[in-house]
Each structure stands twice: as C-alpha cells, then as structure tokens.
Amino acid sequence: MRRMNIAAMAAIIGLGLSACGQQQTAEQEAAPAPAPASTVTVFQGATLIPGDGRAPIENGVLIIDGDTIVSAAAAGTVEIPEGATVIDIPGRTIMPAIYDTHVHLSADRAGVVNDLIRRAVFGVGAAQSMGRDSDELIATRSDLVPGGARYFSAGRGISRSEPGRPEGPFWIESVEEGVEAVQHLASVDVDVIKVWVDDRNGTVEKVTPEMYGAIIETAHELGVRVEAHIFNEEDAKGLLRAGLDIFAHGIRDKDIDDETEALFLANPNIILSANLPDSGYPTDLSFLEGIVPADTLAAAQAENVEDADTQETFGIQARNLDRLHNAGVTVTLGTDGNTPWAPHLELE
C-alpha cells in the first residue's frame, strides 16, 4: 500500500516531470521493466455522502479502480487493496457529482465548453441548458469535454412572441404552430421541451391552455417530456391537469392551496425544479476565495446584501417548496443561470 497526502503527491509529480528531462543511462535502459502500478486509488478520512439514501459516512473510505467506484464505506469495514495509492483527506466531504437541471449556457460552442469546464471545478457533473440553444449547438452534446460537465439541452424552447427579440425560442401564435415547434424539437432529439407559459410580468401574451395542451400531447406522442416556466398558481393547476412532466420553477405568486397540492399528488411522476431565487439575506461566499478571480468575488459580494422585498419573494417559494417536498413531490436542483458555483448556494 502506498500512502500519500496531497502535498506529497504534488512533490512527486514535480520530481517526476523533472526526471523526464534527464537522459537515461545505459544501465537504466538495461534495467528490467517495473511491475505495473496499481490502478486503485483510495481516499480516506473524509465524510462520504453516498447519494443513495444512506446517512453520511464519517471517516469514510472511497475506493476507486480506474474510473469505477468500487466501494464507499466506513474506515475499518473495508479492506484496502494491496498496492493501492492512499490519499488522506480528513475534514473533507465527498459527494456524488451534481446535476444542475436548469442552466442557461453560452450561445456558442466555445463558450459552452468553457461553461462546462468551470462547472466541473465546482463538482457539477451534468448541466441541462433550458432553452434558446440552436440546433447546431445541441448537435454537439455528444462531443464530451475533457474535464468538463456533461451537456444536455432543451433546444430553443417555445414561447409567445417577445417584442424586440429577433431570435430565441420558437414564437407561436396558434395551436398549429405549437405542434410544429414540438415536432421540430423532437426531430433534433432534445432532452426535454421547454415552454414559457407565463406573461413575464405582462410583457408577452401567455401560452394558452389550448396551446400548451397540444404541446404536451404532441410531445408525449413523440416520447419527449415537457417542462414549463410558470409564475402563478392558476397556470400551474392548468398544466397539471394537462399532464405536464416538469416545472422549471415553483409557484411564485402566493402560498399554494390544498387543490394544488392534490393535483401534484395526482401526478406521481411530476418533477419540481424549484430554482429558488436569492434569499435576500447575505450569504457566506468565502468558499470562493482562491477559486474565482478576486474581482469576480468582489462583484458577487457587492450584490450580497439584505433586501426585504427579495426576502418576501423567497419566502413564498421556500414555503411552497417545503410543503410539496414534505408531501412527497420529487424535487430536483436547478439554478436558472450561468454561475458555476450556484448549485452550492441552492443546496444550502
């Protein structure tokens, strides 16, 4: 068993790189080849969050063989393979990679690649872009980014016309146009179809029940789930009755009533991606020090202030989320933006 701490590993890597530049002697060239190194790496001493419903494991041992996790258990309950590289990380926490189900990535491939790499730094293993991605961009989903998160996409999405915006989602003004948009999105194999239903604070017309009913029905016929951007409770009720699969936001205009909870529970496969807004209370961002540029952190801190109006908005959504979660509704994480560390604030 080879035991290393992180500092020692860095030193050895540095020495190894230095040695690579030295010319081998005839004696070294004649030496027998060394035995193959073990492919097993062990991280021990950290708290492990298994992600399968079990409680966190204190003083855990995580055993990885190549690119496969073979064991996650408490110290003393599992045997460390002979020849394994052991890395001691007491005081750390290891958890499964995060799947951020609601992001808005850059508009071009180079930007998306950068976005995915930045997310991996913060433990995000997959990110789903929720609308406005071009057909050309979503065609690159299978092009994995080394060291980056996986990329999923809703494509362009569907909305009523938005004045002043020349491009973006499929603009629809009829049931027929909604159906055509779904057929196109399904043809490019989007991961989910997004529809913006609400009026965006009175700036656009709503997608009508007839429109979103046809969108949901057509998408289901084509084997694609539908996710809706909503604001108020009445729209949520209509979408639940129409068979919606996923909410891209929680209900934000009021505390939900018993009928809404009953409609959620009558749809056992419904998913709520809550996307809680800023809480309106200052947040500890010290974990970003040394990870993001100082000016980026300073800008984030400048906006990190107490705000009573934001607290009220947050309170409505937090209460609704808590009620539906306690009732048994499936909740997923989403952050609705392009901030790579945002999932950690959302989890908190």
Please name every model-derived segment.
Residues G45, R92, I98-S106, H229, ...:
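Histidine-centered divalent metal-coordination motifs
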Residues G21-Q23:
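Bacterial signal peptide processing site
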Residues I89, T93-T101, G111-V226, E259-A300:
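Divalent-metal coordination cores built from histidine and acidic residues
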Residues A33-P34, L48, D52-M95:
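Histidine-rich, glycine-flanked metal-binding segment
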Residues L240-F247, A266-I271, G328-T330:
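Glycine-enriched alpha-helix->loop->beta-strand junction motifs that scaffold or abut catalytic
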Residues E221, T313-E348:
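His/Asp/Glu-enriched, well-ordered alpha-helical/loop segment
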Residues G16-A19:
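C-terminal motif of bacterial Sec signal peptides marking the signal peptidase cleavage site
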Residues M1-M9:
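Bacterial N-terminal signal peptides that target proteins for export
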